[in-house]
Structure formats: structure tokens, C-alpha cells
Amino acid sequence: MIICKTREQIAKMRDAGKIVAEVLALMEEYAKPGISTAELDQIAEAHIRKSGAVPTFLGYGGFPASICASINEEVIHGIPRSDKILQAGDIISIDVGATFRGYVGDAARTFPVGEISEEDARLIRVTEESFF
């Protein structure tokens, strides 16, 4: 069953999505060699909370983090850890959710870490093109 939303509800949904987009932009900026996925999680959570939102994933079904972070061949929804350090040549997939005024924004992106192989760059490019 589809529930039609009011203009006000749609605006709130957009606001939640905007926060997620801002977090993903930060993740792209900070996803550099030497940073841990736990540090990325802390950056994401700080921005979500500063924006007046709540990290949607944190505590959901016992999930211990604000983002899901998966490096290279790891399946999405990886748990950020302080011992998972990004290396040049990695690709990282990050999933972010933010609940704002009762509405959830949720999106995932994959980013290169430093210089990556042509094959990995093509994978990211083709995947992005299929969505946009």
C-alpha cells in the first residue's frame, strides 16, 4: 500500500537525505590511506548529531556503529573497527542512515582510497552510472 506524503513530509524526507549526502561527502573527503573505519564512523556520527539527526543504524538490531563500512571485497554492512585501516589502492563502500524529524535518509557510496586499479575505477564508474 502506498501512502501519499504531504509537502511537509516530503520536505522532511529531503532534509534527512541532505544530511546523508553531507555525510557521504565527508566520507569521500576523509577516506584516505591511514584512517580507520572507526574514525570514519566517529566523523559521520558527529556530523549527523550536529545536524540535529540521529544515526539510524546505531543500535538497530544491536548494530554497534553509525555507518556500515566495507573494504574491497567485503560484503556491505561491515562494522567499523579501529584496526581496519585504509590502505592506498583500497575501495571502501560506506552506507549511512540518518533519522531526522521522524524520517530516514539512507544511501551508500563506494570511494577510492588513493590511487586504485583501472579495473576498480571502472567498477565504481559503471556502478555510479547505473544509478544516476
Please provide the spans of the model-predicted regions.
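Active-site neighborhoods and metal-handling regions in enzymes and metal-associated proteins
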Residues: 1-132
